[in-house]
Amino acid sequence: MQTHDGKTAVAIIGSGNIGTDLMVKILRHGKHLRMGAFVGIDPESDGLKRAERMGVPTVSTGIEGLLSHPDFGSIGFVFDATSAGAHARHEQLLRPHGVRVIDLTPAAIGPFVVPAVNIEQHLDAPNVNMVTCGGQATIPMVAAVSRVVPVEYAEIVASISSRSAGPGTRANIDEFTETTSNAIVRVGGAQRGKAIIILNPAEPPLIMRDTVYCLVPGHADRQAIVESVERMASAVAAYVPGYRLKQTVQFDEFKGRMPQETGSAQAPRLKVSVFLEVEGAGHYLPSYAGNLDIMTSAALATAERIAARQPVAA
């Protein structure tokens, strides 16, 4: 639903790190979006207080307060930045109202969306899931390899600063691995996938670092893989400026067996290794929190793309 200025009003549920950073991004950079409501459950939270200072309508009674808010009818999008468990309930309550839902939890009720890979396939979905921070960073690389050559197995390792992992992130650790592993297959195109997350306690905090391993046929065109990876990195950096390749793509011959394989060793294969780092934009969160920045940036890019298709009110 759009106003005379052509912008769609949105609500954000979740006043923690991710929700607050997303709010700041929309206020500063929203092209087709404007803040309609910022929703939390703790009136003393930094996020709700910051929203009030920035002139954003706030709700401190959770989704029930949002649904009863006098301006709820003008809301076109709801971003859910709470937890996987809470999102299932939120989705049930929101669905009858017909608002579009952008899910930043690992609940995965709607289809997985990684903007650089598959956003055009899900522009009409009522609920889209942003996978996980590790998924947003690494699945584009798996997809970049799989569009050139079949990927038998892909494994991602996401290392994030422990300081950037708030209560929501820690509560969702188990869902992180399951959701990301599923998305490596369903979005990345790998035949099998595995995800590992590391909370790095180092001080001073280190920025997000990700490693992507893909197992491909030994005859794969290495140059084509490199070029595809570099193109994909540029596509992601278009909406996450701090996203970059840490070094050149690495290739190693792999002649052994995977843990689940039996019988004699397979024909020689290649292990493709891609090394990434993600530096945050520093809108609300420190620059080392690239894991949170990539989630909010991907969610914003997704909603902007969907909103851009909607007719402008006269």
From Swiss-Prot:
For this UniProt record, the keywords arranged alphabetically read as follows: Aromatic hydrocarbons catabolism, NAD, Oxidoreductase
Record's Gene3D superfamilies?
Answer: Dihydrodipicolinate Reductase, domain 2 (3.30.360.10), NAD(P)-binding Rossmann-like Domain (3.40.50.720)
Q: Enumerate the active-site residues.
A: 133
Enzyme class (EC, first level): oxidoreductase
Q: Which Pfam families match?
A: AcetDehyd-dimer (PF09290), Semialdhyde_dh (PF01118)
EC number, as in UniProt: 1.2.1.10
A single Gene Ontology biological process assigned to it is: catabolic process
One GO MF term? acetaldehyde dehydrogenase (acetylating) activity
Q: Work out whether the entry's keyword set contains Calcium.
A: no
The domain of life is Bacteria
Q: Which family does it belong to?
A: Belongs to the acetaldehyde dehydrogenase family.
What name has this protein been given in UniProt? Acetaldehyde dehydrogenase 2
Q: What is the lineage of its organism?
A: Bacteria, Pseudomonadati, Pseudomonadota, Gammaproteobacteria, Pseudomonadales
